[in-house]
Amino acid sequence: MGLRKYKPATPGVRFMIRNDFSGLTKKEPEKSLLVPLKKTGGRNHYGRITVRFRGGGHKRQYRLIDFKRDKIGIPAKVSAIEYDPNRSARIALLVYADGEKRYILAPNGLQVGDTVLSGIDAEIRVGNALPLENIPLGTLLHNVEIRPGSGGKIARSAGVSCQLMAKEGNYALLRMPSGELRKVHIKCYATIGVVGNEDHKNEVFGKAGRTRWIGRKPHVRGMVMNPVDHPMGGGEGRGKGQHPVTPWGMPTKGYKTRRGRRASDKFIVRRRNQV
């Protein structure tokens, strides 16, 4: 998989860098693993905006991804590597020995025809899922559970991974993609390897229209709003008149907003800002 740059034939492609999709092996998704995806425009069930600057975009269908990897001991063959519009990573279509089909995140190096397995007896090989207690130190992981049986929550974006640093009692020490060191129970499952499509971070949309295609609207600065719409709005000229704040008056640009004394604090050995 690589990136494609364009000659400046038009203003829209002058700076555009996009994926060439050369690693995909199938164009149409598996129909049995699709569910409808209704757009919300950033609104909740009360109709109130909970995420600003969302709306429009191309219609999508959601691909059901197996984050739990709970078919223990049943081998599966990689049937295809596909595009997923709902995430930055590619997805792999698995066909299990009993005939069931599932999607998983496609790690770097996984190819069509490979066999993957979940369980304590699985080999340390890209695409296999094992409990942390059965994985050697230093291994790069993705799709890591926070609680046993909850399904993978950590390291699911394109090109990211966790590293298993140590094991102490009932907990394993993981280095997160952010650099944070965190304890996770050793019974939690994780998948071997780094999430594929690592060139995603180097893509450049090149024009505002491509941002609208994915459902993002222009992000308006508070300083150019009216006083009724933002604490920093109004005034003569471009003066802020105060420290930068969010639309709800909370200080921003470096202000720490994480609530203190959370129950999960005991699992964080080193914060990401202490690296």
UniProtKB/Swiss-Prot annotation:
GO CC annotation terms, alphabetical: large ribosomal subunit
Biological process (GO), any one: cytoplasmic translation
GO molecular function, one term: transferase activity
Entries under Pfam families matching the protein: Ribosomal_L2, Ribosomal_L2_C
Annotated SMART domains: Ribosomal_L2, Ribosomal_L2_C
PANTHER family: LARGE RIBOSOMAL SUBUNIT PROTEIN UL2M (PTHR13691:SF5), RIBOSOMAL PROTEIN L2 (PTHR13691)
Name of this protein: Large ribosomal subunit protein uL2
